[in-house]
Amino acid sequence: MPCTTILVGKNASYDGSTLVARNEDSSNGVFEPKRMRVVHPDEQPRVYTSVLSHLTIELPDNPMRYTSVPDVVPGHGIWAEAGFNELNVGMSATETLTTNERVRGADPLVDYVPAKGNEGEDGYVPAQPGGLGEEDMVTLVLPYAKSARDGVRILGELLERYGTYENNGIAFSDVDEIWWLETIGGHHWIAKRVPDDAYVTMPNQLGIDSFDLDDAEGAQADHMCSADLRDWMAEWHLDLTLGVEGDGPAAVFNPREAFGSHSDSDHVYNTPRAWYMQRCLNPSDVWDGPEADYTPESDDIPWSRVPERKVTIEDIKYVLSSHYQGTEYDCYGSKGTPATRGAYRPIGINRNSQLAVLQLRPYAQPAYRAVQWMAFGSNSFNALVPLYANVETMPEYYADTQARVTSENFYWANRLIGALADVRFHECGRAVEDYQEKVGGMGHKQIHDADAAVATLPEAEVPAELARANEAFAERVRVETDALLGKVLYTTSCAMKNSFAMNDNIR
């Protein structure tokens, strides 16, 4: 999916949490309805078959309960996207990445090949299943991962065995670490630990810009990779590091140069998003003019960097909702020209499906440590709401999305608000900002109060109390969301082209 990701190490976050956040964006012209779900062990398949690639995999018989954000409309797979399991391991998958022709030739993607002819007749060729994809990964890994590293290991083994039909980035987190895995070609992969004092920005582009092969093949303190990566790179001359003697890759090399892309479309679709996110979190750098450290089209924007101050939930929401505010590239702005205002792909876009922020709080007990913040629809007009993950069920307001358009659930209410507010952006702006700030404040207080309420409970009683807290807060969110929908509907209705100032009737 065309998504945007930000990862925040525990020493760079406002409260010591590891933070993993990703927009799931539908393809252009598609608006995929989403919902929240808790998947129980008896609901997890023991034999899994992918809808898109027709790949069948036997799964272990000991899955854990986990949260997910699946598609609503059936027919093209689960697309579970993001969640936590019972051990407070988080996973967000996937960020679609780019690659290059050399990698595609060295390790082709594993595409599904339909059968040819009719079975039993001469010339019949059976279908060949494809590899793994975004449709599958959370379902295949999250129920079994015991730590962030373990999630990397499990997915890495699956990739080496079955391959993949697309290039993807995947985040794994626990209370101590965040790991970012990038697939390389059909069967290869690398993974890097996010520095504790740094954040990572990821548009739809292979991002890791420094990788230590010796560490990946040895202690694996900060790097992991597919078993034959060094030999494969040497065979196909993939390392582009200058001055390296011999045929093999450098011990420390730049994967973005070796495996990634620097295309014209990257400079319109991808690099501007990394530029703006880092502009927000490191504002003292020079971002504009001829002396700029980085421009929207720079190919060397760092994968990770230390922020100027600690990063909050609100910072994450802002950058993942952004449309280049304060620059000539803002599609709603007045700076620049019509050409500059439409030059680059916004992060907060009309086809945001959902945003999941996975927070693991070290100061909270394991029974209520994991909080999954959720937003649906276009991020420029929605609000994040917190949900405790250690629960048996999700509130109906978040879980009961249907294909039918209605204002009775959080997904469709936010879709309606976004479509109405977009056309009267400035007139609706104050109401939207007030809603976002109020719901955000309510969310922080909700978590603080619920933490206190469960702190002295026996562990076995905590999930039920957390579920009640989630449900009560969802009802408060419903009230605020309905009120905002009414406000933007009124504002946009008043501005309809067929309005007329003379009254026929006054009540």
Features from the language model and the residues they span:
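Short, charged, surface-exposed loops that flank catalytic or proteolytic processing sites
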Residues: Y144-D150
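A contiguous strand-loop segment
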Residues: P2-E134, I154-D293
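Short Pro/Gly-enriched beta-strand edge/turn motifs at strand-loop
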Residues: P60-Y66, V152, S334-G342
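Soluble extracytoplasmic regions of secretory-pathway and membrane proteins
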Residues: A21-R35, T96, L181-T183, V319-D330, ...
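Substrate-recognition/cap regions that form aromatic- and gly/pro-loop-enriched pockets
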Residues: Y324-Q325, Y329-T456
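Histidine-centered catalytic/metal-binding microenvironments
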Residues: Q436-R507
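Short, well-ordered beta-strand elements within core beta-sheets of diverse protein domains
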Residues: V138-Y144
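Glycine-rich, aromatic-lined ligand/substrate-binding cores of catalytic
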Residues: D231-Y368
